[in-house]
Amino acid sequence: GAIDTPGEDPHHWGFEVNIAGHAAGGLASYLGEENYGHTKDGKAVSLMSVPGLEKYWGTETFVTEALTLEAIKALDKAKKYNQPFYLYMSQYAIHIPLNKDMRFYEKYKKKGMTDHEAAYATLIEGMDKSLGDLMNWLEKNGEANNTIIIFMSDNGGLASESGWRDGKLHTQNYPLNSGK
């Protein structure tokens, strides 16, 4: 739902748990060091500041990893109480800003990518790792054959307009001629 309406709160849509979800379509920062877009005293710097991940503030935990860790905790809780679960996992990746996920950044720089392209690649790899971690949890806990996974996105490859991309473009949106 839109900002400042009841629909912006996932609890109003029937969700029992909300981890870092809000009405903004993106985020202010992927970086725990930047408190995901909050000042040190907890004030949001913009409507895009990510709520609900305060325990990761000031750490090197990229928001993609923080969301994955929290999702796994929710799955662990459902498993502990032998409850069925519905996990709606909505990553912020690969939305702008193009913050670098340092877990993967050097790998792409060594391949000769520009800073922008390497940062973009780290967002994709971080999301891939997140999905892999969730799939591993399902396998380890005997839930893989009893779980339906639907993977979708509202984003195409990042647009090629000046300022968004540089160097060789590693994504394309054919037959469309721009992004999203």
What does each of the following model-derived ranges do?
Residues 5-14, 96-100, 136-180:
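Histidine-centered active-site microenvironments of extracellular/periplasmic hydrolases
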Residues 53-54, 65-67, 128-130, 153-156, ...:
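A short linear-motif detector with a strong N-terminal bias
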Residues 62, 66-79, 106-147, 164:
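A long, amphipathic alpha-helix that forms part
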Residues 17-20, 85-90, 123-125, 148-152, ...:
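Structural recognition of the beta-strand scaffold that forms the well-ordered cores
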Residues 50-56, 112-117, 151, 173-177:
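Flexible glycine/proline-enriched surface loops and loop-helix/loop-strand junctions
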Residues 26-32, 37-49, 132-141, 166-180:
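Substrate-binding rim/cap in mid-to-C-terminal beta-strand-loop elements of soluble/periplasmic
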Residues 2-85, 91-100, 109, 118-121:
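Formylglycine-dependent
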